[in-house]
């Protein structure tokens, strides 16, 4: 099962840790079920990747592994992920690598788009947003300086979301 794959990678990490020095994210799968997390994540922080490009294209009957391959590893999304959604946190002598979950990834991408639109001067298109927005609620007005709020349930990673948005 998927947790056998997770345990196998933990063994590799312990025995040949240098192999993982440049690892951005860890994907474990049994060929159907798949989870994405960081190299230092425990099993509870290994989460499914539920979408391809945004919340509107969430596959219903697709294997989780296919969703990870088509969504998480889509080149332009993966490069954005590696650049903006991999974080490090020091806890004493230990450095933990943390990565955003799919919900954080898509929420931050939408929040950044909304922020860019709300921050631009009306009549000037210095900042252009080339991707179609996935809108939640009212449209963001250019120049309004009002970009909205990202809402998460308790324990779902608001700190990571805000760090990625600010970063």
Predicted feature residues:
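ATP-dependent helicase/translocase motor core
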Residues: 1-167
